[in-house]
Amino acid sequence: MLDTQQIKEIIPHRYPFLLVDRITEVEEGKRAKGYKNVTANEEFFNGHFPQYPVMPGVLIVEALAQVGAVAMLIKEENRGRLAFFAGIDNCRFKKQVKPGDQLHLEVEIIRARGTIGRGKGVATVDGEVVCEVELTFALGE
């Protein structure tokens, strides 16, 4: 298990854009699981939407990408590198994520060759799928 401080040693994201609180499982270069506790104090709720706070779907995708980045960047040969979005495919949002939810994030790396890879991400709340996506990434310096 990795806490926030340990996650920050692997990926460069910081408040308010670090969207993973814990990594609960990781297999280097293969998969990772983690979660984000979604609180009413999140900056994005100030404008999305003040009377009906909903976590923006693109931030759910970003949270999944950060979990996938941990799976890739925890590998010794990738330490100090960055993981960049190269594509998003087959993205579906199935339910809203609201303050008080614990967003569970799981990414499986389905292909990685050189500096390009692809992962399948699933986000759930209370066991129900809220988002599914295929992520393409590029590793850079």
From Swiss-Prot:
InterPro entries in the cross-refs: FabA_FabZ, FabZ, HotDog_dom_sf
GO terms (BP aspect): fatty acid biosynthetic process; lipid A biosynthetic process
Catalytic machinery residues: 48
SUPFAM superfamilies documented for this protein: Thioesterase/thiol ester dehydrase-isomerase (SSF54637)
Tagged with keyword Lipid biosynthesis: yes
Domain of life: Bacteria
Residue intervals passing through the bilayer: none
Catalyzed reactions per annotation: a (3R)-hydroxyacyl-[ACP] = a (2E)-enoyl-[ACP] + H2O
Main location: cytoplasm
Subcellular location: Cytoplasm
GO cellular component: cytoplasm; membrane
Molecular functions (GO terms): (3R)-hydroxyacyl-[acyl-carrier-protein] dehydratase activity
Keywords: Cytoplasm, Lipid A biosynthesis, Lipid biosynthesis, Lipid metabolism, Lyase
This enzyme's EC code(s): 4.2.1.59
Pfam families: FabA
Function recorded in the entry: Involved in unsaturated fatty acids biosynthesis. Catalyzes the dehydration of short chain beta-hydroxyacyl-ACPs and long chain saturated and unsaturated beta-hydroxyacyl-ACPs.
HAMAP family: FabZ
Family: Belongs to the thioester dehydratase family. FabZ subfamily.
UniProt protein name: 3-hydroxyacyl-[acyl-carrier-protein] dehydratase FabZ
Species annotation: Bacillus subtilis (strain 168)
